[in-house]
Amino acid sequence: MKVFIGLFLSLASLSSSLARTPALILTQLIKKNFVEQARNLSVVDPKLFLNRTSYSGFFTVDEKLNSNLFFWYFPAENYKPDTPWILWLQGGPGSTSLAGLFDEIGPFEYSNNELKLRKSSWGRDHSLLFIDNPIGAGFSFTDSPDGFIQDMATCSSHLYSALRQFRLVFPEVSKAPLYIAGESYAGRYLPALGVKILEQDRAIGILDVNLQGIIMGNPVLSRDSIADYSSIYYQWGLVDSQGVQAVKPLQDAYNKAILDEDTESATELRERLLNRLDEMSMQQQTFNILVDEINHLDDFVSYIRKPEVSEALHVGSIEFTFHNGTAHKKLTPDFLSEVRSKVEMLLNHYRILIYCGQMDLTAPCVPNAKARRKHWHWNKRAQFLSAARTPWMHDNRVAGYVKSGGSLTEVLVRGAGHLVPMDKPAETLVLISYFIKGQDLPQPPNYHVMVQDTAAYIDDDTEGISKTILQVPGDPHSGTQAVMVVSIVLNVLLLLAIVCGVVYGLRWKRRTDAYLYNNVDETSITSTMF
């Protein structure tokens, strides 16, 4: 009987799989100019998603390898023809952008086995487009192992192709202002995509994509700016100065791998260094120093894997992957690739918002901010450096600090970690809304910027991973020890000088006496002294 039941269930499962509608590849319809049909077929059953209007499907971005990016689009609840639209990309690399949808900014969230409307959704006044990027993340798939990307050039080419096809199916967004956004490793995707859009517009001689700004949350922009993890853990009190010394061989090896541009070694050493620091401090994750564990990020996966939900999303039999290890590993060569020049180019044409959660250990705020001031050079840099850094308010409380000028807005969010929209949803909605509107964040009542509170920027050349001696910032004994060493050296030198002076004086006295009292001639004096 058990065998019969098992066979029946297997056949039922197989029948269900075979009955699924194939994945909806809109590219095939676009090529035939069946754009309206493509749009109609991509409609998602709203009954499964709290009656929210949305569209989903796939765009082919590499025909030879049959590589396809999955998208899910939500027109704004308060839609108007000029409503801004936001493209959201998750980090990882290799993580699904549906994590941003369900866990952070989308119209709904999945909690306690049910969908609920999100109070602080970005989707009320902005249309939201989520793309699973790169190939392999989420529902995005390829038919070939060669379909997994290894660099940002391919990544930006794929995303640009998907955006072009998307705008053909949804032409109402073509002239609307576009903001490309994301967090963490998306700090590498977004500059690459922004430059691709800029270059394509230049090539055709018109503003084809109405890109207005880039929004990056806790972005991973350059490894050298956040290489000194041991000092970061020290500053948070997670290890002491002896702990810093204990991991110094690993820290120095990681620094050297970065300077040598040894991607494989740097990737491995970073993981080993963070694991060692976490073991020493019993820090269970690096996303938020105030939280023991980050749970429930993938709770929604069980929901979208339901047959009726997969059918509604038009994914056919494509398997969903929350985080694709292959996609992650394939991007290892990009680990140390240079991003700064792309950001500098974009700052000369677009506005950029970088927000950072204060409690993040993965991409901590302070070293990243220092690197921006020191290494980024664009034509309006002086305006940013001279701008005052001021508190900003939300709900009658200081929500963080903002510095804005020369196309760059830098915001620190108090109490948030790596996933800022999840930790501080209302505050994050406020800051992106004000940025998109081009407005200043609210300041405390009666707050006045004092000129003397913003000193001229001074470039500190003593910082960086090239320093040969690891000094522990803030160690009260490090300064004392240095003074003691200098004092000892000076005292020893002084003592030697006194001894030499006494010896030389005695020798001079003997020789002078010999000359005066023993009638030693000048030749003998010279030979004795020299």
Can you annotate each of these PLM segments?
Residues 2-530:
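Terminal and linker regions of secretory-pathway proteins
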